[in-house]
Amino acid sequence: MRNQTLSAIEPRLMDWLKTLLHSILHLDEALPQWAAAYGPWIYGILFLIVFCETGLVVTPFLPGDSLLFAAGAVAATASDSLNVHLVVGLLIVAAILGDGVNYHIGAYLGDRVRNGNRFIKKEYLDRTHAFYEKYGAKTIIIARFVPIVRTFAPFVAGVGRMSYGKFLCYNVVGAIVWVVSLAYLGYALGNVPFVKKNFEIVILAIIILSILPAVFEIARGWLASRATVAEPKGES
């Protein structure tokens, strides 16, 4: 019975993932369609996506960097659909509130999730801890530009009981820098012919550039662990 249920769910899940991926890669098409379908509620949709991506550790897969860039680009090409300044203001608030909620969830759960659980992967927590070891409290700002780590940084700050006043300062600065830089970059480049013609490639490039720091950290950690394991063999 369980296998039959899983068999029925898997095709729907795959279809949903394909739809999500298509929407992320074609946000230049999706956002105007959402604006036409939902009117001013498009701002609420964008707010909710950014809030969930930053505020809930179970939704790190939602678009962040690419969404901000795309929203700015669409505002440049279709100002009747989106107002870039309103988008920037709302999404700064969404990012601040999201990180704040995430911090308090981490503080509430505390030691119960230090080693991960069925919903929170330990490798994500370890990766975020590594960022804190390297950058300290500035991780709250730097992590804004690193997918997955961005979602887990405020959570780990809460688990580690970082001073909320200190966290809030970094949270506000990070949210402003993140949203303003990416949304206005999209707005500045939105009417550039190359960007308009190759929007999917541009979004892919943003995603790849976003995850490169995490990839380098993982590779460095893997090489360091291999070197540690190999040392005793070399000595013998």
Model-derived segments and spans:
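Membrane-interfacial helix-loop-helix
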Residues: 9-47, 73-166, 191-206, 213-236
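Transmembrane alpha-helix interface/packing and boundary motifs in multi-pass membrane proteins
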Residues: 47-69, 210
